[in-house]
Amino acid sequence: MGKIIGIDLGTTNSCVAIMDGTKARVLENSEGDRTTPSIIAYTQDGETLVGQPAKRQAVTNPQNTLFAIKRLIGRRFQDEEAQRDKDIMPYKIIAADNGDAWLEVKGQKMAPPQISAEVLKKMKKTAEDYLGEPVTEAVITVPAYFNDAQRQATKDAGRIAGLEVKRIINEPTAAALAYGLDKEVGNRTIAVYDLGGGTFDISIIEIDEVDGEKTFEVLATNGDTHLGGEDFDSRLINYLVEEFKKDQGMDLRTDPLAMQRLKEAAEKAKIELSSAQQTDVNLPYITADGSGPKHMNIKVTRAKLESLVEDLVNRSIEPLKVALQDAGLSVSDIQDVILVGGQTRMPMVQKKVADFFGKEPRKDVNPDEAVAIGAAVQGGVLSGEVKDVLLLDVTPLSLGIETMGGVMTPLITKNTTIPTKHSQVFSTAEDNQSAVTIHVLQGERKRAQDNKSLGQFNLDGIQPAPRGMAQIEVTFDIDADGILHVSAKDKNTGREQKITIKASSGLNEEEIQKMVRDAEANAEADRKFEELVQTRNQADHLIHGTRKQLEEAGDKLPAEDKTAIEEAMKGLEAALKGEDKAEIEAKTQALVQVSGKLLEMAQQQQAAAGGDAGDTSAKKEDDVVDAEFEEVKDKK
């Protein structure tokens, strides 16, 4: 069996590693570097350049030099992230026919997985040159907060590059594997703080060692994928542009060539300021006007850079608190802190993390290489080269379906270990309902519409039955790559429908973050909404039952009692159209009071009939959830 290589497909840089005996080895590319810039250029003479050669010619070819493509992979054109990048990137971001964010290069439309595949091809070639044999299988890493669409798109990129992606693995988890594999760590709980070029993740991971076998179990994960080195660069670029404008009265933003030079200089200055207290951004002939050429020479101190990005660093702290809370741990329970991603070399980042955890982060993990090493270890586990290692990862957000009253009913909660499968039995909301719509949702809110819709499908051919009698079993199945499969089965007829959530309907990371933030900020509103829905459902059941009793025993009631019940039902139905929980409760109580006589008669009638009519209602299975389907009409 050939080697399964490990690839860290990064926003800014990528890296490839293999298992060499019992050790993972990071491989040098054809330029002699252990990491490769994730930059792809299409030249005028039709050549495709990847990595350092592409970066070197970016200044003279900004429109056709593509970088930070990972920020677009698996995204819709209308997503906030894609729209923001559209305005600031020198290359052209367009809408594909299916609504995805694509790119236009030299008049040709290209999909992000197609472009990322060029980087993966270079990683594949680097491994093949070292091994002297073809490579066809890989483990590729993604941010822990990547959703279904982004994971699918990453797998597609691998396939385009000629690789069978054996496993998609989360970056912080890969870093933990790299850290824990060759160390006699015993049982430890570690925090992996991963601040890369485009994304931020935090994972709390427990490493258990029993009889030489190590289990890496992710307890909780959180993150913010609008946070990374690219954002730090942007702050410095904006500062330099404004300073130049004050000094020379010219706005460099209108000049793509100048902006490309400035981007390179800002990145270099940021890196230098991790070891030096100040640096010069010196760009002669940056632009020109009628009076002649203009030069940029601006001093930047470390303190200035820190003041520009302080809020970005602070933004990474909130997810740390949430992850610890989700794991049920406190700061004192964390034994080791591991920093991953080039941006963690910034002293300010290291200090903030050390202050939060009350301990210095470990310095024996290479932040640029740890993720690729972990991916290679997982490749070794899958190929059988690495024994005695078990990896247990989690899903970052809750998954569920919409049920009666517009409620999100979770089937799999966030931070559940994957792969996992969960089934639950639901029922129908109407008498003789022949079809149900399964509306799949992702998020933490109680109200269905406040979560992200992942897709919907119909299960029809249900046998006609009174409401609440049909048994619809919904199954959610998440595979080891974190990709979701949903099925619905009518237990009476055996009819079944399945759906694999497709990439075009995935969540973007901004939405995930928004959901989690909203869930925290709106916990009280969610609780009130849940109570309102419960009250509504109880009232709805009461109306349904009373109407049935009226049909069966109403002719034995005095006319004025019957009229009073009908009026009370009308009043309750009117209250149900509003949002006032107190009014619904009051009208429910009113209906209960006036229908007391009717209930007595219905019970007497049932007793006289030997209780036959009561048998059917007892047949409802114990595990049927008291939340029901309504048919969801597509909003056109």
UniProtKB/Swiss-Prot annotation:
Coiled coil: none
Pfam family, one: HSP70
Ranges where the record places region Disordered: 603-636
Positions where Phosphothreonine occurs in the chain: T199
Gene Ontology biological-process annotations: chaperone cofactor-dependent protein refolding; protein refolding
InterPro entries, per the entry: ATPase_NBD, Chaperone_DnaK, Heat_shock_70_CS, HSP70_C_sf, HSP70_peptide-bd_sf, Hsp_70_fam
Entry-linked Gene3D superfamilies: 1.20.1270.10, 3.30.420.40, Actin, Chain A, domain 4, Substrate Binding Domain Of DNAk, Chain A, domain 1
GO molecular function terms listed in the Swiss-Prot or TrEMBL record: ATP binding; ATP hydrolysis activity; ATP-dependent protein folding chaperone; heat shock protein binding; protein folding chaperone; unfolded protein binding
Induction: By stress conditions e.g. heat shock.
Gene Ontology cellular component list: cytosol
UniProt xrefs under CDD domains: ASKHA_NBD_HSP70_DnaK-like
Alphabetical keyword list: ATP-binding, Chaperone, Nucleotide-binding, Phosphoprotein, Stress response
Record function comment: Acts as a chaperone.
Family statement: Belongs to the heat shock protein 70 family.
Name of the protein described by the UniProt record: Chaperone protein DnaK
Name of the gene: dnaK
